[in-house]
């Protein structure tokens, strides 16, 4: 069955067509399917070319969800550090060090905004080439993989940059202040993304469609799963849905390391981003939680429970217990 974009009144935005099992399949795969169904010759299946072109734009919409959060949070963490008395000189030096540490394979330091702009231009060119039949199916699929890879490299370095800044927070102010820092900068994110799940306003059952869809959409945007294409493991239980990521492309990759580029765990040198050393309520009462992963507890469980007595989702994260330990390597589960 063809995959296309449609409007969701429940969510208030355009979404991908398909049942829940289909939503667990990466948008990259769906673009490839539509391209192959369309073929290289203009004719009856021309609409499948248009479907695939629109899905390329939607791939960028998924990526945007993550890019904007990373952009807003990274700036917020830095503003918080300045408010706590860190000098601009010290902060700029640390960010510059991290940008060099996150250099691309060709040695180019991380510069997020120019990379995002270039990604948008490349994706737009791909969509136009698909629509106009200027690209064969084979050429379009090859270019799609280039777009995906460009986003993966930018995504991963942006996640690492945030993890590095959070490690700087811990070094300067101690582990307990991570919670203070997160709470200070997450409010716009909570308002935009999670206030619709306030059960004082809307019964939980009526939010399930939105909750599950935006979870799958965001994790496709993170490019989770084998080969970093955005494929998700989705299980329907009698009383709940379970989604798993192998790997989670942010915190899970921070703990495991990056097989795509052959680099090691960000807990270890040369990164040394660290993990939670003292069990706390906002770290699932566990040690070994990466600093980045703690936001999932705060945003999805702790803060919603404080405000309306009910979590948005529950999370069972991987825990650092050393390289290759099963707890480190396990799937993240929501």
Where do the PLM segments sit?
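N-terminal accessory segment detector
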Residues: 1-295, 299-333
């Amino acid at each position: 069955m063809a995959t296309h974009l449609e409007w969701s009144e429940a969510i208030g935005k355009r979404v991908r067509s398909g049942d829940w099992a289909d939503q667990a399949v990466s948008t990259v795969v769906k673009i490839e399917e539509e391209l192959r169904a369309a073929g290289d010759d203009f004719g009856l299946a021309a609409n499948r070319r248009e479907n695939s072109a629109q899905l390329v734009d939607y791939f960028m919409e998924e990526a945007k969800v993550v890019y904007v959060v990373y952009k807003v949070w990274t700036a917020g963490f830095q503003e918080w550090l300045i408010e706590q008395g860190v000098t601009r000189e010290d902060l700029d030096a640390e960010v510059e060090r991290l940008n060099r540490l996150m250099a691309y394979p060709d040695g180019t330091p991380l510069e997020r905004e120019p990379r995002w702009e270039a990604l948008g231009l490349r994706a737009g060119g791909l969509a136009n080439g698909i629509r106009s039949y200027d690209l064969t199916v084979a050429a379009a699929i090859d270019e799609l993989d280039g777009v995906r890879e460009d986003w993966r490299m930018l995504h991963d370095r942006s996640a690492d940059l945030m993890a590095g800044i959070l490690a700087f927070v811990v070094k300067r102010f101690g582990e307990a202040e991570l919670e203070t820092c997160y709470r200070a900068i997450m409010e716009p994110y909570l308002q935009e993304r999670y206030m619709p799940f306030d059960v004082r306003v809307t019964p939980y059952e009526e939010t399930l469609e939105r909750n599950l869809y935006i979870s799958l959409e965001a994790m496709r945007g993170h490019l989770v799963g084998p080969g970093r294409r955005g494929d998700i493991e989705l299980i329907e239980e009698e009383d709940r849905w379970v989604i798993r990521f192998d790997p989670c492309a942010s915190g899970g990759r921070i703990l495991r390391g990056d097989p795509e580029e052959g680099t090691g765990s960000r807990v270890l040198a040369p990164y040394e981003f660290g993990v939670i050393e003292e069990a706390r309520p906002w770290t699932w009462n566990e040690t070994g939680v990466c600093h980045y992963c703690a936001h999932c507890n705060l945003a999805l469980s702790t803060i919603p429970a404080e405000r309306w007595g009910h979590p948005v989702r529950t999370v069972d994260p991987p825990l650092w217990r050393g390289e290759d330990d099963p707890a480190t390597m396990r799937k993240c589960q929501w």
